[in-house]
Protein backbone atom coordinates (compact mmCIF):
# COMPACT_ATOMS: atom_id res chain seq x y z
CA UNK A 1 0.00 0.00 0.00
CA UNK A 2 2.79 2.34 0.94
CA UNK A 3 4.36 1.85 -2.48
CA UNK A 4 1.31 3.49 -4.15
CA UNK A 5 1.72 6.80 -2.23
CA UNK A 6 3.97 9.25 -3.95
CA UNK A 7 5.55 11.97 -1.86
CA UNK A 8 5.39 14.50 -4.72
CA UNK A 9 1.61 14.03 -5.09
CA UNK A 10 1.04 14.51 -1.37
CA UNK A 11 3.09 17.69 -1.34
CA UNK A 12 1.18 19.01 -4.40
CA UNK A 13 -2.17 18.30 -2.72
CA UNK A 14 -1.04 19.97 0.52
CA UNK A 15 0.29 22.99 -1.38
CA UNK A 16 -3.04 23.44 -3.21
CA UNK A 17 -4.97 23.10 0.05
CA UNK A 18 -2.78 25.65 1.79
CA UNK A 19 -3.02 28.11 -1.11
CA UNK A 20 -6.82 27.92 -0.94
CA UNK A 21 -6.99 28.83 2.75
CA UNK A 22 -8.59 32.25 3.35
CA UNK A 23 -6.34 33.99 5.86
CA UNK A 24 -8.19 37.35 5.75
CA UNK A 25 -9.03 38.47 9.26
CA UNK A 26 -11.20 41.52 9.95
CA UNK A 27 -9.72 43.53 12.78
CA UNK A 28 -12.06 45.87 14.63
CA UNK A 29 -10.72 48.23 17.24
CA UNK A 30 -13.28 48.26 20.04
CA UNK A 31 -13.73 50.09 23.32
CA UNK A 32 -16.02 49.95 26.33
CA UNK A 33 -18.37 52.66 27.60
CA UNK A 34 -17.22 53.86 31.03
CA UNK A 35 -19.78 56.60 31.59
CA UNK A 36 -22.86 58.07 29.86
CA UNK A 37 -24.37 61.46 30.71
CA UNK A 38 -26.41 64.06 28.82
CA UNK A 39 -25.41 63.03 25.30
CA UNK A 40 -21.72 62.48 26.09
CA UNK A 41 -19.95 59.10 26.52
CA UNK A 42 -16.51 58.31 27.92
CA UNK A 43 -14.92 55.27 26.31
CA UNK A 44 -11.95 53.16 27.39
CA UNK A 45 -9.79 51.20 24.95
CA UNK A 46 -9.81 53.26 21.74
CA UNK A 47 -6.12 54.16 21.85
CA UNK A 48 -5.85 55.09 18.15
CA UNK A 49 -9.09 57.07 17.81
CA UNK A 50 -8.79 60.37 15.91
CA UNK A 51 -10.46 63.72 16.55
CA UNK A 52 -13.84 64.00 14.75
CA UNK A 53 -13.84 60.26 13.99
CA UNK A 54 -17.19 58.50 13.71
CA UNK A 55 -17.79 55.70 16.23
CA UNK A 56 -20.57 53.10 16.11
CA UNK A 57 -22.36 51.14 18.85
CA UNK A 58 -23.78 47.64 18.37
CA UNK A 59 -27.34 49.04 18.32
CA UNK A 60 -26.51 51.35 15.36
CA UNK A 61 -26.27 54.64 17.28
CA UNK A 62 -23.31 56.77 16.21
CA UNK A 63 -21.01 59.11 18.13
CA UNK A 64 -18.25 61.54 17.18
CA UNK A 65 -14.92 61.80 19.03
CA UNK A 66 -14.37 65.26 20.53
CA UNK A 67 -11.98 64.75 23.46
CA UNK A 68 -8.76 62.70 23.32
CA UNK A 69 -7.49 62.13 26.86
CA UNK A 70 -4.72 59.96 28.35
CA UNK A 71 -6.84 57.05 29.50
CA UNK A 72 -10.18 57.56 27.72
CA UNK A 73 -11.96 59.15 24.78
CA UNK A 74 -14.85 61.66 25.10
CA UNK A 75 -17.46 61.38 22.34
CA UNK A 76 -20.79 63.10 21.66
CA UNK A 77 -23.83 60.95 20.89
CA UNK A 78 -25.83 61.49 17.71
CA UNK A 79 -28.81 59.63 19.13
CA UNK A 80 -30.82 59.25 22.36
CA UNK A 81 -28.73 58.92 25.54
CA UNK A 82 -31.11 56.40 27.13
CA UNK A 83 -30.23 53.77 24.51
CA UNK A 84 -26.57 53.65 25.60
CA UNK A 85 -25.55 51.97 28.87
CA UNK A 86 -22.30 51.58 30.79
CA UNK A 87 -20.34 48.56 29.52
CA UNK A 88 -21.64 48.78 25.91
CA UNK A 89 -19.13 47.93 23.18
CA UNK A 90 -18.23 50.66 20.68
CA UNK A 91 -16.06 50.30 17.58
CA UNK A 92 -14.06 52.67 15.41
CA UNK A 93 -15.24 53.24 11.84
CA UNK A 94 -11.88 54.82 10.84
CA UNK A 95 -13.91 57.48 8.98
CA UNK A 96 -14.14 61.18 9.74
CA UNK A 97 -17.77 62.29 10.27
CA UNK A 98 -19.26 62.94 6.82
CA UNK A 99 -22.50 63.26 4.86
CA UNK A 100 -23.40 61.72 1.50
CA UNK A 101 -24.56 64.42 -0.94
CA UNK A 102 -26.13 64.34 -4.41
CA UNK A 103 -28.74 65.89 -6.71
CA UNK A 104 -31.41 63.51 -5.34
CA UNK A 105 -31.30 65.40 -2.01
CA UNK A 106 -33.07 68.40 -3.57
CA UNK A 107 -36.58 68.80 -2.20
CA UNK A 108 -35.86 66.65 0.85
CA UNK A 109 -35.72 67.26 4.61
CA UNK A 110 -32.76 65.51 6.25
CA UNK A 111 -30.89 65.33 9.55
CA UNK A 112 -27.20 66.39 9.87
CA UNK A 113 -26.08 62.82 9.00
CA UNK A 114 -28.03 62.80 5.72
CA UNK A 115 -30.86 60.55 6.95
CA UNK A 116 -34.32 61.54 5.59
CA UNK A 117 -36.88 63.04 8.01
CA UNK A 118 -39.74 63.62 5.56
CA UNK A 119 -41.03 60.04 5.31
CA UNK A 120 -40.33 59.84 1.55
CA UNK A 121 -37.97 56.87 1.79
CA UNK A 122 -34.22 56.58 1.36
CA UNK A 123 -32.27 59.09 -0.73
CA UNK A 124 -31.15 57.29 -3.89
CA UNK A 125 -29.08 58.28 -6.92
CA UNK A 126 -25.38 58.98 -7.08
CA UNK A 127 -24.09 60.29 -3.75
CA UNK A 128 -20.67 61.75 -2.89
CA UNK A 129 -19.00 61.55 0.52
CA UNK A 130 -18.41 65.06 1.90
CA UNK A 131 -16.66 65.59 5.29
CA UNK A 132 -18.59 67.70 7.83
CA UNK A 133 -15.38 69.46 8.90
CA UNK A 134 -13.14 70.75 6.13
CA UNK A 135 -10.58 73.52 5.70
CA UNK A 136 -11.86 76.59 3.87
CA UNK A 137 -10.39 77.27 0.38
CA UNK A 138 -7.14 79.23 0.53
CA UNK A 139 -6.84 82.78 -0.83
CA UNK A 140 -5.36 81.66 -4.18
CA UNK A 141 -8.42 79.48 -4.90
CA UNK A 142 -10.87 82.40 -4.49
CA UNK A 143 -11.88 85.35 -6.62
CA UNK A 144 -13.44 88.67 -5.58
CA UNK A 145 -17.22 88.78 -5.07
CA UNK A 146 -18.70 90.63 -8.05
CA UNK A 147 -21.88 88.78 -9.02
CA UNK A 148 -25.16 89.78 -7.32
CA UNK A 149 -27.34 87.38 -5.35
CA UNK A 150 -30.76 89.01 -5.70
CA UNK A 151 -32.90 88.71 -2.57
CA UNK A 152 -36.00 90.27 -4.16
CA UNK A 153 -36.18 92.73 -1.25
CA UNK A 154 -35.86 96.38 -2.35
CA UNK A 155 -34.25 97.51 0.92
CA UNK A 156 -31.55 94.82 0.74
CA UNK A 157 -30.79 94.79 -3.00
CA UNK A 158 -30.60 98.60 -3.13
CA UNK A 159 -28.80 99.52 0.12
CA UNK A 160 -27.14 96.35 1.48
CA UNK A 161 -26.40 94.29 -1.66
CA UNK A 162 -25.33 90.66 -1.26
CA UNK A 163 -22.93 89.02 -3.73
CA UNK A 164 -22.43 85.36 -4.59
CA UNK A 165 -19.72 84.03 -2.28
CA UNK A 166 -20.38 86.63 0.44
CA UNK A 167 -21.25 86.06 4.12
CA UNK A 168 -23.96 88.46 5.24
CA UNK A 169 -25.20 88.31 8.83
CA UNK A 170 -28.91 88.79 9.61
CA UNK A 171 -29.12 89.98 13.22
CA UNK A 172 -31.93 91.16 15.48
CA UNK A 173 -34.18 90.33 18.43
CA UNK A 174 -36.69 87.49 18.29
CA UNK A 175 -39.80 88.14 16.19
CA UNK A 176 -38.26 90.87 14.02
CA UNK A 177 -38.40 89.02 10.68
CA UNK A 178 -34.91 87.47 10.43
CA UNK A 179 -36.11 84.14 9.05
CA UNK A 180 -38.52 85.96 6.70
CA UNK A 181 -35.62 87.71 4.93
CA UNK A 182 -33.85 84.37 4.45
CA UNK A 183 -37.01 82.59 3.22
CA UNK A 184 -37.84 85.46 0.81
CA UNK A 185 -34.29 85.21 -0.58
CA UNK A 186 -34.73 81.46 -1.16
CA UNK A 187 -38.14 82.00 -2.85
CA UNK A 188 -36.62 84.71 -5.09
CA UNK A 189 -34.12 82.19 -6.51
CA UNK A 190 -37.00 80.49 -8.36
CA UNK A 191 -36.54 82.89 -11.31
CA UNK A 192 -32.91 81.74 -11.65
CA UNK A 193 -34.02 78.10 -11.40
CA UNK A 194 -36.58 78.55 -14.21
CA UNK A 195 -34.00 80.42 -16.31
CA UNK A 196 -31.58 77.46 -16.09
CA UNK A 197 -29.03 79.20 -13.84
CA UNK A 198 -30.07 77.85 -10.43
CA UNK A 199 -28.79 78.92 -7.04
CA UNK A 200 -29.22 75.77 -4.94
CA UNK A 201 -30.43 76.64 -1.43
CA UNK A 202 -29.73 74.86 1.86
CA UNK A 203 -31.82 75.92 4.85
CA UNK A 204 -30.32 74.73 8.17
CA UNK A 205 -32.76 74.79 11.10
CA UNK A 206 -30.89 74.64 14.43
CA UNK A 207 -32.74 74.09 17.70
CA UNK A 208 -36.13 75.19 16.37
CA UNK A 209 -39.49 73.61 17.14
CA UNK A 210 -40.44 70.78 14.80
CA UNK A 211 -43.73 72.57 14.00
CA UNK A 212 -41.80 75.71 12.94
CA UNK A 213 -39.58 73.69 10.58
CA UNK A 214 -42.67 71.96 9.11
CA UNK A 215 -44.31 75.36 8.53
CA UNK A 216 -41.18 76.67 6.72
CA UNK A 217 -41.02 73.54 4.53
CA UNK A 218 -44.72 73.98 3.62
CA UNK A 219 -44.11 77.65 2.71
CA UNK A 220 -41.14 76.74 0.49
CA UNK A 221 -43.18 73.99 -1.17
CA UNK A 222 -46.14 76.33 -1.72
CA UNK A 223 -43.95 78.85 -3.59
CA UNK A 224 -42.18 76.15 -5.64
CA UNK A 225 -38.86 76.65 -3.85
CA UNK A 226 -38.35 73.04 -2.69
CA UNK A 227 -37.37 72.10 -6.28
CA UNK A 228 -33.92 73.61 -5.63
CA UNK A 229 -33.78 73.54 -1.81
CA UNK A 230 -32.53 71.07 0.82
CA UNK A 231 -33.64 71.47 4.45
CA UNK A 232 -31.27 70.24 7.18
CA UNK A 233 -33.10 70.04 10.51
CA UNK A 234 -31.78 69.50 14.04
CA UNK A 235 -34.80 70.45 16.15
CA UNK A 236 -34.96 71.43 19.83
CA UNK A 237 -35.72 67.79 20.72
CA UNK A 238 -32.54 66.47 19.09
CA UNK A 239 -29.29 65.91 21.02
CA UNK A 240 -27.02 68.97 21.44
CA UNK A 241 -24.38 67.25 19.27
CA UNK A 242 -26.77 67.13 16.28
CA UNK A 243 -27.59 70.83 16.74
CA UNK A 244 -23.85 71.55 16.88
CA UNK A 245 -23.09 69.59 13.67
CA UNK A 246 -26.14 70.76 11.64
CA UNK A 247 -24.44 73.92 10.22
CA UNK A 248 -21.38 71.85 9.23
CA UNK A 249 -23.69 69.46 7.33
CA UNK A 250 -25.26 72.45 5.54
CA UNK A 251 -21.81 73.80 4.62
CA UNK A 252 -20.73 70.36 3.30
CA UNK A 253 -23.81 70.14 1.05
CA UNK A 254 -23.18 73.69 -0.21
CA UNK A 255 -19.52 72.83 -0.93
CA UNK A 256 -20.61 69.94 -3.15
CA UNK A 257 -22.50 72.38 -5.41
CA UNK A 258 -19.77 75.04 -5.15
CA UNK A 259 -16.93 72.69 -6.08
CA UNK A 260 -18.85 71.24 -9.03
CA UNK A 261 -19.08 74.73 -10.58
CA UNK A 262 -22.56 75.76 -9.42
CA UNK A 263 -23.95 78.41 -7.10
CA UNK A 264 -25.32 77.65 -3.64
CA UNK A 265 -26.84 79.63 -0.77
CA UNK A 266 -26.81 78.32 2.80
CA UNK A 267 -28.92 79.82 5.60
CA UNK A 268 -27.90 79.03 9.21
CA UNK A 269 -30.99 79.65 11.37
CA UNK A 270 -29.58 80.37 13.86
CA UNK A 271 -25.95 80.28 15.05
CA UNK A 272 -26.86 81.53 18.56
CA UNK A 273 -28.50 78.15 19.21
CA UNK A 274 -25.50 76.33 17.76
CA UNK A 275 -23.23 78.24 20.17
CA UNK A 276 -25.49 77.23 23.09
CA UNK A 277 -25.40 73.57 21.95
CA UNK A 278 -21.59 73.69 21.71
CA UNK A 279 -21.38 75.26 25.17
CA UNK A 280 -23.56 72.46 26.57
CA UNK A 281 -21.41 69.73 25.00
CA UNK A 282 -18.14 71.42 26.05
CA UNK A 283 -19.21 71.84 29.67
CA UNK A 284 -20.26 68.18 29.92
CA UNK A 285 -16.87 67.21 28.43
CA UNK A 286 -15.32 69.34 31.23
CA UNK A 287 -13.53 71.69 28.86
CA UNK A 288 -12.43 75.00 30.43
CA UNK A 289 -15.06 77.72 30.05
CA UNK A 290 -14.55 81.41 29.28
CA UNK A 291 -16.78 84.47 28.89
CA UNK A 292 -20.50 83.72 29.46
CA UNK A 293 -19.42 80.07 30.09
CA UNK A 294 -18.71 79.56 26.37
CA UNK A 295 -15.57 77.52 25.60
CA UNK A 296 -12.44 79.42 24.55
CA UNK A 297 -12.66 78.29 20.91
CA UNK A 298 -16.22 79.54 20.25
CA UNK A 299 -14.85 82.22 17.88
CA UNK A 300 -12.94 79.55 15.95
CA UNK A 301 -16.14 77.47 15.73
CA UNK A 302 -17.95 80.19 13.79
CA UNK A 303 -14.96 81.47 11.81
CA UNK A 304 -14.05 78.04 10.40
CA UNK A 305 -17.70 77.46 9.48
CA UNK A 306 -18.29 80.81 7.77
CA UNK A 307 -14.91 80.90 5.98
CA UNK A 308 -16.15 77.96 3.89
CA UNK A 309 -18.36 80.39 1.95
CA UNK A 310 -16.37 81.49 -1.10
CA UNK A 311 -16.42 82.29 -4.81
CA UNK A 312 -14.05 79.86 -6.53
CA UNK A 313 -11.46 81.03 -9.06
CA UNK A 314 -12.21 80.51 -12.77
CA UNK A 315 -8.80 78.97 -13.65
CA UNK A 316 -9.26 75.21 -13.94
CA UNK A 317 -5.65 74.17 -13.23
CA UNK A 318 -5.61 76.15 -9.97
CA UNK A 319 -9.09 75.06 -8.81
CA UNK A 320 -8.22 71.37 -9.26
CA UNK A 321 -5.41 71.75 -6.72
CA UNK A 322 -7.74 73.21 -4.08
CA UNK A 323 -6.66 72.48 -0.50
CA UNK A 324 -8.46 69.72 1.44
CA UNK A 325 -10.48 68.56 -1.57
CA UNK A 326 -12.47 65.38 -0.71
CA UNK A 327 -11.45 62.21 -2.59
CA UNK A 328 -15.02 61.77 -3.87
CA UNK A 329 -14.87 65.11 -5.77
CA UNK A 330 -11.48 64.60 -7.44
CA UNK A 331 -12.06 64.46 -11.18
CA UNK A 332 -15.43 66.26 -11.14
CA UNK A 333 -14.26 69.67 -9.85
CA UNK A 334 -15.45 72.59 -11.99
CA UNK A 335 -14.55 76.27 -11.72
CA UNK A 336 -16.52 79.45 -11.02
CA UNK A 337 -18.89 78.05 -8.39
CA UNK A 338 -19.85 79.94 -5.23
CA UNK A 339 -21.23 79.35 -1.75
CA UNK A 340 -23.03 82.29 -0.12
CA UNK A 341 -23.77 82.19 3.62
CA UNK A 342 -26.60 83.97 5.46
CA UNK A 343 -25.97 83.28 9.16
CA UNK A 344 -28.69 84.44 11.57
CA UNK A 345 -27.98 85.63 15.14
CA UNK A 346 -30.60 86.42 17.76
CA UNK A 347 -29.85 89.35 20.08
CA UNK A 348 -31.29 90.08 23.54
CA UNK A 349 -33.00 93.49 23.78
CA UNK A 350 -31.09 94.79 20.73
CA UNK A 351 -27.66 94.29 22.32
CA UNK A 352 -25.30 93.83 19.36
CA UNK A 353 -22.26 94.22 21.64
CA UNK A 354 -22.79 90.84 23.36
CA UNK A 355 -20.21 88.07 22.98
CA UNK A 356 -21.60 85.91 20.14
CA UNK A 357 -23.04 88.83 18.06
CA UNK A 358 -19.70 90.73 18.09
CA UNK A 359 -17.84 87.53 17.17
CA UNK A 360 -20.01 86.83 14.13
CA UNK A 361 -20.14 90.52 13.06
CA UNK A 362 -16.33 90.53 12.96
CA UNK A 363 -16.24 87.32 10.86
CA UNK A 364 -18.88 88.21 8.24
CA UNK A 365 -18.77 90.64 5.27
CA UNK A 366 -21.54 92.84 6.64
CA UNK A 367 -24.77 92.66 8.59
CA UNK A 368 -28.47 93.39 8.19
CA UNK A 369 -29.68 94.68 11.57
CA UNK A 370 -33.41 94.36 12.30
CA UNK A 371 -35.06 96.50 14.97
CA UNK A 372 -38.11 95.72 17.11
CA UNK A 373 -39.29 99.38 17.12
CA UNK A 374 -39.28 99.60 13.33
CA UNK A 375 -41.06 96.24 13.10
CA UNK A 376 -43.80 97.46 15.47
CA UNK A 377 -44.17 100.67 13.42
CA UNK A 378 -45.01 98.54 10.36
CA UNK A 379 -41.66 99.05 8.60
CA UNK A 380 -41.05 95.58 7.18
CA UNK A 381 -38.40 94.38 6.56
CA UNK A 382 -37.49 96.25 9.78
CA UNK A 383 -33.94 97.13 8.67
CA UNK A 384 -32.00 99.80 10.59
CA UNK A 385 -30.17 101.37 7.64
CA UNK A 386 -27.74 103.28 9.89
CA UNK A 387 -25.91 100.25 11.29
CA UNK A 388 -26.57 97.75 8.48
CA UNK A 389 -23.79 97.41 5.94
CA UNK A 390 -22.48 95.24 3.12
CA UNK A 391 -18.68 95.27 2.87
CA UNK A 392 -18.90 94.16 -0.77
CA UNK A 393 -21.15 97.12 -1.63
CA UNK A 394 -21.72 98.21 -5.23
CA UNK A 395 -19.49 95.43 -6.59
CA UNK A 396 -22.44 93.09 -6.01
CA UNK A 397 -24.98 95.20 -7.92
CA UNK A 398 -25.87 95.38 -11.59
CA UNK A 399 -24.92 98.75 -13.13
CA UNK A 400 -28.47 100.12 -13.35
CA UNK A 401 -29.17 99.40 -9.66
CA UNK A 402 -25.81 100.89 -8.64
CA UNK A 403 -26.60 104.08 -10.56
CA UNK A 404 -30.19 104.46 -9.27
CA UNK A 405 -29.69 103.42 -5.63
CA UNK A 406 -26.21 104.87 -5.15
CA UNK A 407 -27.31 107.67 -2.79
CA UNK A 408 -30.40 105.98 -1.32
CA UNK A 409 -28.70 104.64 1.83
CA UNK A 410 -27.15 108.02 2.66
CA UNK A 411 -30.39 109.85 1.86
CA UNK A 412 -32.38 107.60 4.20
CA UNK A 413 -29.82 107.93 7.01
CA UNK A 414 -29.94 111.73 6.58
CA UNK A 415 -33.76 111.66 6.61
CA UNK A 416 -33.84 109.69 9.90
CA UNK A 417 -31.49 112.26 11.45
CA UNK A 418 -33.51 115.26 10.24
CA UNK A 419 -36.79 113.64 11.29
CA UNK A 420 -35.46 113.22 14.84
CA UNK A 421 -34.58 116.95 14.96
CA UNK A 422 -37.88 118.02 13.36
CA UNK A 423 -39.73 116.78 16.46
CA UNK A 424 -38.18 119.64 18.44
CA UNK A 425 -38.94 122.38 15.92
CA UNK A 426 -42.19 123.27 14.17
CA UNK A 427 -40.76 125.63 11.53
CA UNK A 428 -38.52 124.10 8.83
CA UNK A 429 -36.84 125.60 5.80
CA UNK A 430 -38.17 124.33 2.43
CA UNK A 431 -35.08 122.17 1.67
CA UNK A 432 -35.33 120.31 5.01
CA UNK A 433 -39.10 119.85 4.54
CA UNK A 434 -38.49 118.46 1.03
CA UNK A 435 -35.76 116.08 2.29
CA UNK A 436 -38.05 114.75 5.03
CA UNK A 437 -40.98 114.34 2.60
CA UNK A 438 -38.78 112.48 0.11
CA UNK A 439 -37.35 110.29 2.91
CA UNK A 440 -40.80 109.38 4.22
CA UNK A 441 -41.99 108.39 0.74
CA UNK A 442 -38.85 106.36 0.07
CA UNK A 443 -39.32 104.58 3.42
CA UNK A 444 -42.85 103.67 2.27
CA UNK A 445 -41.48 102.41 -1.06
CA UNK A 446 -39.04 100.11 0.76
CA UNK A 447 -41.84 98.41 2.75
CA UNK A 448 -42.60 95.02 1.23
CA UNK A 449 -45.05 92.23 2.18
CA UNK A 450 -43.71 88.82 3.19
CA UNK A 451 -43.25 86.13 0.49
CA UNK A 452 -43.51 88.64 -2.36
CA UNK A 453 -39.96 89.21 -3.66
CA UNK A 454 -39.72 91.68 -6.55
CA UNK A 455 -37.67 91.18 -9.77
CA UNK A 456 -34.64 93.46 -9.95
CA UNK A 457 -35.86 95.40 -13.02
CA UNK A 458 -39.08 96.41 -11.21
CA UNK A 459 -37.04 97.41 -8.14
CA UNK A 460 -34.83 99.71 -10.25
CA UNK A 461 -37.84 101.37 -11.93
CA UNK A 462 -39.72 102.14 -8.70
CA UNK A 463 -36.55 103.23 -6.84
CA UNK A 464 -35.77 105.63 -9.72
CA UNK A 465 -39.11 107.32 -8.97
CA UNK A 466 -38.18 107.63 -5.29
CA UNK A 467 -34.60 108.87 -5.66
CA UNK A 468 -35.47 111.37 -8.44
CA UNK A 469 -38.37 113.01 -6.60
CA UNK A 470 -41.10 111.75 -8.97
CA UNK A 471 -43.37 111.09 -5.96
CA UNK A 472 -43.47 114.77 -5.00
CA UNK A 473 -47.20 115.13 -5.78
CA UNK A 474 -48.23 111.72 -4.42
CA UNK A 475 -49.66 111.81 -0.85
CA UNK A 476 -47.75 109.64 1.66
CA UNK A 477 -50.70 107.29 2.27
CA UNK A 478 -50.98 106.60 -1.50
CA UNK A 479 -47.32 105.71 -2.15
CA UNK A 480 -47.85 101.94 -2.13
CA UNK A 481 -50.95 102.30 -4.30
CA UNK A 482 -48.84 104.41 -6.72
CA UNK A 483 -46.19 101.66 -6.76
CA UNK A 484 -48.77 99.00 -7.74
CA UNK A 485 -50.27 101.13 -10.54
CA UNK A 486 -46.83 102.21 -11.80
CA UNK A 487 -45.50 98.62 -12.06
CA UNK A 488 -48.72 97.44 -13.77
CA UNK A 489 -48.46 100.30 -16.29
CA UNK A 490 -44.81 99.46 -17.06
CA UNK A 491 -45.63 95.76 -17.55
CA UNK A 492 -48.50 96.68 -19.86
CA UNK A 493 -46.84 99.38 -21.97
CA UNK A 494 -43.06 99.15 -21.53
CA UNK A 495 -42.13 95.49 -20.92
CA UNK A 496 -39.61 95.29 -23.78
CA UNK A 497 -38.23 98.84 -23.96
CA UNK A 498 -37.89 99.41 -20.18
CA UNK A 499 -38.15 96.30 -17.96
CA UNK A 500 -36.26 93.91 -20.27
CA UNK A 501 -33.52 96.53 -20.78
CA UNK A 502 -33.20 97.19 -17.02
CA UNK A 503 -32.84 93.44 -16.38
CA UNK A 504 -29.60 93.50 -18.42
CA UNK A 505 -28.23 96.27 -16.16
CA UNK A 506 -28.57 99.09 -18.71
CA UNK A 507 -30.27 102.40 -17.90
CA UNK A 508 -30.17 105.04 -20.65
CA UNK A 509 -32.06 108.21 -21.62
CA UNK A 510 -34.84 106.29 -23.42
CA UNK A 511 -35.47 104.15 -20.32
CA UNK A 512 -35.46 107.11 -17.89
CA UNK A 513 -37.76 109.10 -20.20
CA UNK A 514 -40.29 106.23 -20.30
CA UNK A 515 -40.11 105.84 -16.49
CA UNK A 516 -40.64 109.59 -15.92
CA UNK A 517 -43.59 109.74 -18.35
CA UNK A 518 -45.26 106.68 -16.78
CA UNK A 519 -44.70 108.07 -13.24
CA UNK A 520 -46.18 111.46 -14.22
CA UNK A 521 -49.20 109.77 -15.80
CA UNK A 522 -49.86 107.59 -12.71
CA UNK A 523 -49.23 110.50 -10.28
CA UNK A 524 -51.90 112.63 -12.03
CA UNK A 525 -54.72 110.63 -10.45
CA UNK A 526 -53.61 111.82 -6.97
CA UNK A 527 -53.69 115.57 -7.80
Curated annotation (Swiss-Prot):
SUPFAM superfamilies per record: C-terminal domain of alpha and beta subunits of F1 ATP synthase, N-terminal domain of alpha and beta subunits of F1 ATP synthase, P-loop containing nucleoside triphosphate hydrolases
Main location: membrane
CDD domains: ATP-synt_F1_alpha_C, ATP-synt_F1_alpha_N, F1-ATPase_alpha_CD
Site for Required for activity, residues: 388
Topology of the protein relative to the lipid bilayer: Peripheral membrane protein
Keyword Ion transport: yes
Keyword set, alphabetical order: ATP synthesis, ATP-binding, Cell inner membrane, Cell membrane, CF(1), Hydrogen ion transport, Ion transport, Membrane, Nucleotide-binding, Translocase, Transport
Subcellular localization(s) per the UniProt record: Cell inner membrane
Subunit-level organization: F-type ATPases have 2 components, CF(1) - the catalytic core - and CF(0) - the membrane proton channel. CF(1) has five subunits: alpha(3), beta(3), gamma(1), delta(1), epsilon(1). CF(0) has three main subunits: a(1), b(2) and c(9-12). The alpha and beta chains form an alternating ring which encloses part of the gamma chain. CF(1) is attached to CF(0) by a central stalk formed by the gamma and epsilon chains, while a peripheral stalk is formed by the delta and b chains.
Name of the protein in its database record: ATP synthase subunit alpha
Protein species of origin: Bacteroides thetaiotaomicron (strain ATCC 29148 / DSM 2079 / JCM 5827 / CCUG 10774 / NCTC 10582 / VPI-5482 / E50)
Amino acid sequence: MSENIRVSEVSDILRKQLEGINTNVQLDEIGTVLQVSDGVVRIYGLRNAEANELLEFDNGIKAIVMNLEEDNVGAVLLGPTDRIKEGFIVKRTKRIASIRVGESMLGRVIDPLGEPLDGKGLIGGELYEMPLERKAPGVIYRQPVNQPLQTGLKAVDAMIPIGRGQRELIIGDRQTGKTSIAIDTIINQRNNFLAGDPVYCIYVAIGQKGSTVASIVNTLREYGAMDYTIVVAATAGDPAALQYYAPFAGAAIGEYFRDTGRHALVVYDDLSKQAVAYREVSLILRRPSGREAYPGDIFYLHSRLLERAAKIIKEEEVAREMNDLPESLKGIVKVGGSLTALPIIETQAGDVSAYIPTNVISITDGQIFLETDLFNQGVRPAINVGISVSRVGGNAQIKAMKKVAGTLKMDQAQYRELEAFSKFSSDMDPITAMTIDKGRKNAQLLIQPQYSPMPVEQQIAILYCGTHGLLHDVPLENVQDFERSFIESLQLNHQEDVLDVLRTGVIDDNVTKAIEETAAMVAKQYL
